[in-house]
């Protein structure tokens, strides 16, 4: 038994700003649906928190520390049954520079 797989595009988005990420996801889903492809998502992935601990004083006072954190938000969008028009429209899409995009076919 051989199962034929439908063509699928998986888009992984990553950004530090969640509002920028959400607007980018909306643009991608709208573009995919405009070209009659089936868009599944955006599926939120767990947010990664990086916490950095820094000494406030340059010399003494080891007890005085300051914490900084940076959060990276991630989303996945799957596009099923993409056509060549869908791929062309996604390539021409203008997204903000603060969003990291990874595309797999």
Curated annotation (Swiss-Prot):
It is found in: Plastid, Chloroplast. It comes from the Eukaryota. GO terms for cellular component: chloroplast; ribonucleoprotein complex; ribosome. Its main location: plastid. Keywords: Chloroplast, Plastid, Ribonucleoprotein, Ribosomal protein. Belongs to the universal ribosomal protein uS10 family. Involved in the binding of tRNA to the ribosomes. This is Small ribosomal subunit protein uS10c. It comes from Porphyra purpurea (Red seaweed).
